[in-house]
């Protein structure tokens, strides 16, 4: 059989495949400049001024400048080049990077999650099996120790939230620091520009940056990579020019002997200056956090071939210039730029600062969405700004909060050195946390020895600890800002997670017994009404208490009932083919099903608006699959709760016994409106006539029908499918709990503060669950419930 006939594409030779991989990685490497390296590449604007501020001004000499450059060179080599490129980029979660990716890996390979909604079926997800299978992972004593102690698992969650809150702090500090630093060049050439005028211009740029976030960056994203590349090439040649013109001997400073000499001369003052040196690697975490948009090869190529050499040459050239112009340290970058190219470089620097700020803002949105997916952030509005670029999101509430805080930083400090102190602490803390989780991954996921993990952790913590300790010395000089921001965001995230856990625990312990459910019938005055009732809860098993409340207050429920649970699993993405997990709750005559809708922590929830039709198709496929199972007849008379199957609505379109057709129904204007004398109704009539001159309203409606091949199925299966179709035609109602969560009277004062004040405030001021799930308001039934947790 020919390849075309068999459906198998012709095999490509190895040279073709290698060329395709090379070209693909080169394209991704090019695109990564605008997303990953914007922040890191603008560091030369403020590193040397921040390093030589404070007591180090007493050591303004050539040896100190050479030593500072040597420190910057080895910092760039050890942290971005060795730690991130060689080690961390190998620890991805299905291609995703960042602290949450490492935590997700740990949650899959060890039972670290505090929310007990995991199921065995989740482990069958294709993304779940990435890396060593959980079936083959040997239960090490360290892993068992973590799983047994809830306090340790809580501590791990707190560390993750601490890191996430620090990243949010980066989203506040980076725009203020980058924009102010790029604009500082105006004062180098225009002496009459005051600090106040510079601040006003910076605020205008910052307001414009945040105000345009709702438009999405995809319209101008194609410019991001060229801007950063032009910036890197510019600073490379400026650095090369300064080396040749001012002091070619600076090349010798790559030797670590200059670091020893530097500390021997400067002593404690030199150690404190490390808080400025670490600014040379701010933005490095973006190489790992944005891994999901690229490949590890593309990020490695971009950094090793372009970014690293350009930054090293620029810092070397700036140091060569400063060694002969010690008075230019406060504005070292712009003073080192040759006059003929000053204005082009100034424009490119400002644009590069905006690109770097944009990348950090986008990362902040992504981190908050991941926190929300893991149940650690209140429900917020997530707007997807691009139909073509997956994961490009905008969060209005967070955007305006970031803008207000960023403006407060710029106006309050007015000094890039103070903001740099805060920014350096935030970045180094995130790196510190990433190193810690990487060590855990080495033991738990990679199954390497604890000695190797301890060696990795100890080596990097010693290096990073030196920088962090120096940065912490500047807490009183602006360094307190990231801790205040982190404390606020972390408290909000943990309180929300704690309240969510307690609420889930209440639901779990107050599930309705199956015996009660089986006893529902006409003898109790219960009526089954036409339609499908979707009962939403967070329970993945059992019948939620809101259903009993609903039936108690309104003794009727729908002919078809589906208990729906929308939950997140510790993987970045769940494919549409694996999204729906369908099962049966009661014997067949009850027409009760369970649907678990699974999303990854980076997935988009219900964006297509076709949830009802996908659900009906999946249930129909489940009924068909169950009928073909020879063992199903043996268990038909008993409860099938707990038996779940993965169903694909996409697959059912081609193989299902249901056919889907879209019909256009025509509704005519109500005759009561036409004959009424009411002014209001008459105005409505005029609206109808303007929009539909014929008095017709056209509506699209999806209908399901059994295929011709369904005649061979059993009568009971056909009847069940017809009941499902008729119920869908009758309409779909959404039943949700309107919850009031309160602490018990016997609770401690701390718990009362967390639940009655903190969680209650967040719940009242966040989006409702119905809005977050895009549930049509006209079809919503809310059942009031009080949760005493």
Swiss-Prot record:
Topology in membrane: Multi-pass membrane protein
Inducing or repressing factors: By potassium starvation.
Keyword annotations of the record: Cell membrane, Ion transport, Membrane, Phosphoprotein, Potassium, Potassium transport, Transmembrane, Transmembrane helix, Transport
GO cellular component: cytosol; plasma membrane
Function noted in UniProt: High-affinity potassium transporter.
PANTHER family: K+ POTASSIUM TRANSPORTER, OSMOTIC STRESS POTASSIUM TRANSPORTER
Family: Belongs to the HAK/KUP transporter (TC 2.A.72.3) family.
Name assigned to this protein: Potassium transporter 4
Protein's organism: Arabidopsis thaliana (Mouse-ear cress)
């Amino acid at each position: 059989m020919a390849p075309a006939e068999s459906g198998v594409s012709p095999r490509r030779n190895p040279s073709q495949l290698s060329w395709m991989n090379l070209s693909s990685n080169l394209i991704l490497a090019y695109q990564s400049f605008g997303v990953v390296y914007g922040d890191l590449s603008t560091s030369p604007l403020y590193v040397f001024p921040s390093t030589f501020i404070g007591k180090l001004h007493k050591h303004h000499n050539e040896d100190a400048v050479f030593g500072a450059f040597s420190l910057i060179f080895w910092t760039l080599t050890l942290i971005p080049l060795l730690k991130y490129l060689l080690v961390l980029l190998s620890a991805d979660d299905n291609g995703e990077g960042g602290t949450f990716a490492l935590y997700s890996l740990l949650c899959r390979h060890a039972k670290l999650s505090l929310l007990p909604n995991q199921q065995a079926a989740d482990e069958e997800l294709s993304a779940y099996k990435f890396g060593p299978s959980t079936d083959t992972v040997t239960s090490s004593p360290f892993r068992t120790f973590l799983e047994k102690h809830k306090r340790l698992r809580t501590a791990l969650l707190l560390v993750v939230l601490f890191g996430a809150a620090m990243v949010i702090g980066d989203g506040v500090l980076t725009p203020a620091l980058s924009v102010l630093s790029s604009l500082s060049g105006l004062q180098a050439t225009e002496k009459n520009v005051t600090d106040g005028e510079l601040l006003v211009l910076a605020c205008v740029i910052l307001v414009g940056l945040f105000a345009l976030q709702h438009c999405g960056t995809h319209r101008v994203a194609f410019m991001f990579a060229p801007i950063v590349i032009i910036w890197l090439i510019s600073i490379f040649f400026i650095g090369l020019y300064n080396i040749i013109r001012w002091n070619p001997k600076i090349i010798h400073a790559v030797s670590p002997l200059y670091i020893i000499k530097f500390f021997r001369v400067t002593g404690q003052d030199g150690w404190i200056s490390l808080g400025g040196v670490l600014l040379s690697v701010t933005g490095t975490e973006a190489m790992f956090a944005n891994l999901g948009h690229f490949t590890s090869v593309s990020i490695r190529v971009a950094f090793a071939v372009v970014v690293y050499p350009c930054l090293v040459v620029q810092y070397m050239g700036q140091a060569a210039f400063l060694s002969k112009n010690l008075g230019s340290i406060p504005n070292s970058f712009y003073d080192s730029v040759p006059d003929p190219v000053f204005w082009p470089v100034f424009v490119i620097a400002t644009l590069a600062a905006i690109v770097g700020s944009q990348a950090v803002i986008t990362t902040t949105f992504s981190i908050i969405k991941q926190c929300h997916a893991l149940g650690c952030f209140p429900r917020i509005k997530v707007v997807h700004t691009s139909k073509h670029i997956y994961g490009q999101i905008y969060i209005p509430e967070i955007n305006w909060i970031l803008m207000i805080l960023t403006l407060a930083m710029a106006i309050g400090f007015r000094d890039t050195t103070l903001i740099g102190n805060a920014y350096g602490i935030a970045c180094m803390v995130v790196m510190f946390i990433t190193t810690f989780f990487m060590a855990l991954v080495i033991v738990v996921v990679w199954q390497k020895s604890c000695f190797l993990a301890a060696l990795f952790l100890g080596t990097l913590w010693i290096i990073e600890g030196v920088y962090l300790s120096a940065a912490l010395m500047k807490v009183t000089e602006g360094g307190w800002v990231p801790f205040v921001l982190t404390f606020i965001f972390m408290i909000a995230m943990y309180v929300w997670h704690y309240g969510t856990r307690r609420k889930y625990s209440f639901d779990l312990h107050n599930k309705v017994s199956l015996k009660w459910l089986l006893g529902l019938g006409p003898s109790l005055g219960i009526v089954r009404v036409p339609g499908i009732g979707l009962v939403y809860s967070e329970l993945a098993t059992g019948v939620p208490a809101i259903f009993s409340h609903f039936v108690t207050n309104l003794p009727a429920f729908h002919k078809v009932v589906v208990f729906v649970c929308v939950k997140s699993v510790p993987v970045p993405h769940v494919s549409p083919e694996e999204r729906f997990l369908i099962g049966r709750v009661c014997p067949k005559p009850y027409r009760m099903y369970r649907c678990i809708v699974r999303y990854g922590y980076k997935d988009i929830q219900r964006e297509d608006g076709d949830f009802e039709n996908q659900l009906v198709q999946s249930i129909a496929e489940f009924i068909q699959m169950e009928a073909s199972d020879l063992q199903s007849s043996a268990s038909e008379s008993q409860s099938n709760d707990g038996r779940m199957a993965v169903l694909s609505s996409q697959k059912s379109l081609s193989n299902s016994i249901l056919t889907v057709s879209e019909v256009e129904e025509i509704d005519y204007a109500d005759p009561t409106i036409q004959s009424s004398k009411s002014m209001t109704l008459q105005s409505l009539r005029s609206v109808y006539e303007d929009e539909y001159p014929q008095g017709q309203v056209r509506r699209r409606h999806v209908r399901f029908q059994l295929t011709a091949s369904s005649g061979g199925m059993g009568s009971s299966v056909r009847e069940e499918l017809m009941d499902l179709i008729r119920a869908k035609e009758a309409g779909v109602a959404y039943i949700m709990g309107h919850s009031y969560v309160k602490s018990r009277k016997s609770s401690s004062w701390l718990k009362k503060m967390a639940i009655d004040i903190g969680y209650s405030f967040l719940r009242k001021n966040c989006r409702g669950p119905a809005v977050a799930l895009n549930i049509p308001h006209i079809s919503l039934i809310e059942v009031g419930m009080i949760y005493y947790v």
